[in-house]
């Protein structure tokens, strides 16, 4: 269940969050491989995440204040999420993501280091905002905004 998302860098937490495309944005657009993306400031994301959006194709967790559960990651080399720093990102994605083939945790870690983090380090922040993982999660699609607990097992 993949959805088109835009990147939102939260410098206060050093977290790159992904939001459904169509959210109100005052950020300048960035050209990415899937079209124009936007990089809204944290305050540009409305409090009622998604109430004004077209909901077709979006999982329930797209409206969580933490962002989509499988598509939230940091720029830290240890690849820890800020929500649950005891689990590495590859392990979370391995459990929750449908968009990638089944891989071991080691393979996933190598995949993200090669495809994402290496480019972040070499190309800098401007390019980093355009590099993201477009996968999916196991949450059901919704017809109306609904809360989603980030910690709920999929």
From Swiss-Prot:
Post-translational modification (record): A fraction may be phosphorylated in insect cells and HepG2 cells, a human hepatoblastoma cell line. Phosphorylated in vitro by host protein kinase C or mitogen-activated protein kinase. N-acetylated in insect cells.
Subcellular location: Host cytoplasm; Host nucleus; Host mitochondrion
An individual GO BP term: DNA-templated transcription
Function as written in the Swiss-Prot or TrEMBL entry: Multifunctional protein that plays a role in silencing host antiviral defenses and promoting viral transcription. Does not seem to be essential for HBV infection. May be directly involved in development of cirrhosis and liver cancer (hepatocellular carcinoma). Most of cytosolic activities involve modulation of cytosolic calcium. The effect on apoptosis is controversial depending on the cell types in which the studies have been conducted. May induce apoptosis by localizing in mitochondria and causing loss of mitochondrial membrane potential.
Keywords: Activation of host NF-kappa-B by virus, Activator, Apoptosis, Host cytoplasm, Host G2/M cell cycle arrest by virus, Host mitochondrion, Host nucleus, Host-virus interaction, Modulation of host cell cycle by virus, Transcription, Transcription regulation
Residue spans crossing the bilayer: none
Region: Mitochondrial targeting sequence, residue numbers: 68-117
A Pfam match: X
Presence of the UniProt keyword ATP-binding in the record: no
Family that this chain belongs to: Belongs to the orthohepadnavirus protein X family.
GO cellular component, one term: host cell mitochondrion
Summary of subunit composition and partner proteins: May form homodimer. May interact with host CEBPA, CFLAR, CREB1, DDB1, E4F1, HBXIP, HSPD1/HSP60, NFKBIA, POLR2E and SMAD4. Interacts with host SMC5-SMC6 complex and induces its degradation. Interacts with host TRPC4AP; leading to prevent ubiquitination of TRPC4AP. Interacts with host PLSCR1; this interaction promotes ubiquitination and degradation of HBx and impairs HBx-mediated cell proliferation.
Name the record gives this protein: Protein X
Native species: Hepatitis B virus genotype A2 (isolate Japan/11D11HCCW/1998) (HBV-A)
Coiled coil segments of this chain: none
């Amino acid at each position: 269940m993949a959805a088109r998302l835009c990147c939102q860098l939260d410098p206060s937490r050093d977290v790159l969050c992904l939001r459904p495309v169509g959210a109100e944005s005052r950020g300048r657009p960035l050209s990415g491989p899937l079209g124009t993306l936007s990089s809204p400031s944290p305050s540009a994301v409305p409090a009622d995440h998604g109430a004004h959006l077209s909901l077709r194709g979006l999982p329930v967790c797209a409206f969580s204040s933490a962002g989509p559960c499988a598509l939230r990651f940091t720029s830290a080399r240890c690849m820890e999420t800020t929500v649950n720093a005891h689990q590495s990102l590859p392990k979370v994605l391995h459990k929750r993501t449908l968009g990638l083939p089944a891989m071991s945790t080691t393979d996933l870690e190598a995949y993200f280091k090669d495809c994402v983090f290496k480019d972040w380090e070499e190309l800098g922040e401007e390019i980093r905002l355009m590099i993201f993982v477009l996968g999916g999660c196991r949450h059901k699609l919704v017809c109306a905004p609904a809360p989603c607990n980030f910690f709920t097992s999929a």
